[in-house]
Amino acid sequence: MSRIGKQPVSIPSGVECSIKGQLLSVKGKKGQMTLDLHPFTKITSEDGFLKLNPVVEDRDHWAICGTMRALVHNMVVGVTQGFEKKLLLMGVGYRAQAQGQKLTLVLGFSHPVEYAVPQGITIETPTPTEIIVKGFDKQLVGEVAAKIRAYRPPEPYKGKGVRYAGEYVMIKEAKKK
């Protein structure tokens, strides 16, 4: 069984945490996030640490407590450092261009695909075949990267498509006569 829920979350300098009942608010240099904690958990702030405990000492309550602790830790890391995901475009003529809050993708369709970037996310294209998704909300960064990848996921025969940096695509062998 994981013991993540028993570890406290350290609050670095420059981060403000406020607890109002089951609502936790974290504010840092990158932004502000709020989390509605599960009723099975109670949170306390002690000398630079946030400590989560279950309401009842039970296996299920500790499991929820571990999940909540991971979400709180991601909030603290997000408002201090932020998160980023890198995507690569593989294929002849595949390219991307970021213009403000809009991402234009040319992925071999008859038309360019336009993606409206949500609030709190910034997208950079250092090269036409590279996309970097940045933000302070880990869930939102992952969701945006997954939506961009879903436009043209890597196909198994040539590996063409949008893939995460470091993702291994299993290449199948072509059918033999």
UniProtKB/Swiss-Prot annotation:
Instruction: Check the record and name the SUPFAM superfamilies matching this protein.
Output: Ribosomal protein L6
Q: Which GO terms describe its cellular component?
A: cytosolic large ribosomal subunit
UniProt key word Kinase? no
Q: Name one GO biological process term.
A: cytoplasmic translation
Q: Which UniProt keywords apply?
A: Ribonucleoprotein, Ribosomal protein, RNA-binding, rRNA-binding
Q: Give the InterPro entries listed for this entry.
A: Ribosomal_uL6-like (IPR000702), Ribosomal_uL6-like_a/b-dom_sf (IPR036789), Ribosomal_uL6_a/b-dom (IPR020040), Ribosomal_uL6_bac-type (IPR019906), Ribosomal_uL6_CS (IPR002358)
Q: Name one GO molecular function term.
A: rRNA binding
**Top-level taxon of origin:** Bacteria
The record's annotation in NCBIfam families points to: L6_bact
The record's family statement is: Belongs to the universal ribosomal protein uL6 family.
How it assembles, according to the record, is:
Part of the 50S ribosomal subunit.
Function, in words: This protein binds to the 23S rRNA, and is important in its secondary structure. It is located near the subunit interface in the base of the L7/L12 stalk, and near the tRNA binding site of the peptidyltransferase center.
Q: Would you tell me the protein name for this molecule?
A: Large ribosomal subunit protein uL6
Species name for this entry? Dichelobacter nodosus (strain VCS1703A)
